[in-house]
Amino acid sequence: MTRSPPSRRSARRRPRGSGRLGPAGAAPLVTVVALSLFLSGFCSIISELSLFNLAEGLLGGTNANLTYTMGLMMFAMGLGSAFTAHRWFRNVSVEMFIGVECALSVLTMISVAGIYLLAGWLPGSAAILIWTVSPLVGLLVGLEIPIVMRINEVLGLRLRLNVALVMAPDYFGALAAFVLFTFLLLPWLGLGRVAWLGGLLNLLVAGLVALMFRAHLRHPLAVPAGVGVLLVLAGGLGWRMPDLMAFAEQLHYRDGIAQARETPYQRIVVTDRRRKGNPAYRAPALSGKVLARRGSIVLREIRGRHAAYCAEDIRLFINGGLQFSTCDEHRYHEMLVHPALSLVENPRQVLVLGGGDGLAVRELLKYEGLAVHLVELDGVMVELFRDDPRFARLNGGALADSRVEITVGDALRFLRETRRRYDLIVMDFPDPHQTGTARLYSTQFFRFAGRALAPGGVLATQSMSPLFHPRAFLSVRKTMRAAGFQVVSLQVPMLTFEHWGFQVGSRRQSEGEMQARLEAFRPAVPTRYLNREAVQAAWRWSKEFLLDAADVPINDQFTLPLPGLYRETLRR
């Protein structure tokens, strides 16, 4: 008696635990896979945003960080997708999917803390580490999507539905990461725990897949157990993450960290020499990226970590860059405020843009009858230097003074919308090392500032080091002139910043008239550094320096050449 051939339906059946997939139970698997893709997109973007923020602190806030993180990840995603055409991926399985998810989760969880630690122990390694981790994340994401599409194909999904099911959750997860990262996760959890959370969520879904579909696994006990072990280790890592990040962060600072705050806008760190710091801290002469060479002179970048010492040294760092040191901040703020104010007849209203540490406000409040309006983007900065007695004493309690009005918001938006007029506008912004801060030194910004000036009003701004960033310094000068200001450039020697520059502009007074008034400058209030001779020296420059600006571009907000000029340093 001859047997009839098996039907196609029976031929497609797979033995239990074979690792192969079939249409049976497809609906719950599809749902879990869609959730996994959502969290995978969330995890990958969280990882890259965390690395991008870390790169701002370790490498400096430049647009190149987008290439080092997002750019490399997208490129590696393409490589990962291409790899799935290899014969190794011919027969996909749930185990393969779980393995990729676990690898992505672990890499995300340890990426920030691991790079931060290694960069502290191995100065100069940060860029290499970030260039390595970012594409690895992209490679795993690139592997994951084609694997899921093949799994869905085995489950019998049509191509159109398959593509929609795979791509839509991934993109939705990416959007959720972008929205939640800046305004919720980063301020609440900090950089290390945000990356850890992204990896943990992805790992939980991998565990859910392993439990729900053990029948499809070749190793139905070992795989869920392995994911469980990873979850236990992840829990321990999350518990110790704040201590681990604090230890890693201290490696990057000579002095002990007195306060560290993460905000939606920046990482704020305040150090105090009297606190125990990093005993293995390397002086700038021994470490750091070489920026330029001139004969036997070597200029190195040390992320704003300078080796100057004084009896009491409290320093503010934003995203790893030094903003001030109590060794010499009085020189900076006295030169920023007093010469410009001396050019105004009977000043009454002063606007300070930036300067949330209150040190420029402190200098202004030395004058009787002045009302000061401070506009600062980061409210946490204001709270720190107004409410914490350790730091409020540095500005003499200026931010709590009744003569000071504080607005937390964007400076450009404020200038666009305000109808108030000010006798003096003081701009105390961070350096324009990226497009976000470079817009604050653009022609359009200076025009808005000029519109907010009262007749005869004066505008003063810091403008980087004329020694280390000469073309950027000259670009700010030319940009102010293009915005309709006559400009006098000032300079001051410092311990921490070596040599710093400022621009003072007026639409009513000529450059010669302002120079004549500065020549006769006498401090009207007590100062620590500034006197008549210091101001007389501050506005005098060599003929060669100021005339060497012919090929320096104006910083228009649509081209923004200033970040590139800032990075040129001593190329001349």
What are these regions (language model features)?
Residues T2-C310, G320-G321, S325-D328, V337-Q349, ...:
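Alpha-helical transmembrane segments of multi-pass membrane proteins
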